[in-house]
């Protein structure tokens, strides 16, 4: 979820801003298939379960904060990788993404690497969903291209994923 609200918007952090260029470079230089997610909420966000626990409007569909960061968009335009449609998700993890990856790669020998925001919420949720859908596939997370809500929660999420056989690079 390399979206404006997570980088320099309503939920942005210094750490998130610091990974934009490394993430863009990774996208630009990647060869393979790129899938992505977009945190997507509606105007009623504050009345949802998530909104009650995190009462900060963010990633409202169609607003500037919902859009991908411009440097990330430029990298997507320049990459030679095959970029697939990004999955819109109203929750931390994307069941749709896990299902697409399962249907596409279940009988193939592939590696899946995750990058992005936020390590301790969406990245860990998606990593666990993907690992559950594809238990024999190597799943990894590039920690240099991730940031959490806080540096401590970022580290905790990396440790938790490591315990679930997700490689941290």
Positions of the model-derived regions?
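Active-site acidic carboxylates
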Residues: 2-85, 107-108, 136-140, 149-163, ...
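Short, contiguous clusters of charged residues that form electrostatic/catalytic patches at enzyme active sites
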Residues: 21, 66, 70, 95, ...
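A short acidic (Asp/Glu
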Residues: 46-48, 124-127
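Conserved N-terminal glycine/acidic-rich loop preference
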Residues: 86-125, 147-169
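Short beta-strands and strand-loop turn motifs
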Residues: 115, 139-144
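Gly/Ala-rich phosphate-binding loop of Rossmann-like dinucleotide-binding domains
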Residues: 131
């Amino acid at each position: 979820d390399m979206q404006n609200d997570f980088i320099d918007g309503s939920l942005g952090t210094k750490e998130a801003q610091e990974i934009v260029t490394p993430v863009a470079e990774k996208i630009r230089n990647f060869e393979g298939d790129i899938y992505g997610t977009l945190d997507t909420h509606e105007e009623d966000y504050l009345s949802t379960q998530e909104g009650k626990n995190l009462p900060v409007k963010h990633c409202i569909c169609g607003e500037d904060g919902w859009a991908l960061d411009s440097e990330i968009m430029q990298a997507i335009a320049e990459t030679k990788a095959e970029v697939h449609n990004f999955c819109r998700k109203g929750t931390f993890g994307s069941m749709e993404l896990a299902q697409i990856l399962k249907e596409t790669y279940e009988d193939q020998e592939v590696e899946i690497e995750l990058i992005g925001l936020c390590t301790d919420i969406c990245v860990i949720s998606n990593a666990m969903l993907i690992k559950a859908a594809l238990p024999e596939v190597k799943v990894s997370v590039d920690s240099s291209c991730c940031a959490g809500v806080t540096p401590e929660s970022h580290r905790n999420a990396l440790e938790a994923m490591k315990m679930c056989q997700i490689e941290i690079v």
